[in-house]
Amino acid sequence: MPFSEEPPRVVRLGLSDQVFTFTDATGTEWHWNASLGYQLIEQAPRPPMEFYPSDSGIDMTHLRQRYPSLNEEYAKTVDLSRPILFLPFHDGTSVLCDGWHRLARAVMEGIPCLPCYELTPEEAEQVLVIKIPPKSQPPKLAPMDTQKGRRKP
């Protein structure tokens, strides 16, 4: 596999930075620094937008499927005034990078709307920590003929 001509990018993570991991349909793992996303929002202030979970078909069944380890008891305690954070994804969709518990609380309590931010594509690139390609299967070897007969791979 040839190396990229592009110089490696240095990513700094603080001990308290929250990193969100997402595995797409191809098996590629994406890791984003959500804490840095909020810092970028502070550096380029913008008003929060509104997100309506029901408009996207989000209910508790959906949340439990997408986030199997969701702590519903903790979700009941989170601050709904803090905007959730989306980032644009390469397939034209948006990915929730931070705010799963806030989203769960809103759905559980029937709160129709949450404040949210969406990073720009440039900001999303800045908060990308690493993209790990899917694990590939080792190539299948063809049987070999040897002096003792056909050898299985």
Language-model features and meaning:
Residues M1-Q65:
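Glycine-rich short-loop/terminal segments
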Residues S4, R9-V10, P47-E50, D55, ...:
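Intrinsically disordered, low-complexity segments enriched in proline/serine/threonine
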Residues V10, L80-P134:
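A short, basic-hydrophobic beta/loop patch
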Residues N33-S35, T77, L103:
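Enriched - but not universal
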Residues L40-C97, V107:
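Short alpha-helix boundary/capping and kink motifs at helix termini
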Residues P121-P153:
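Amphipathic, charge-rich alpha-helical segments that serve as recognition/docking helices
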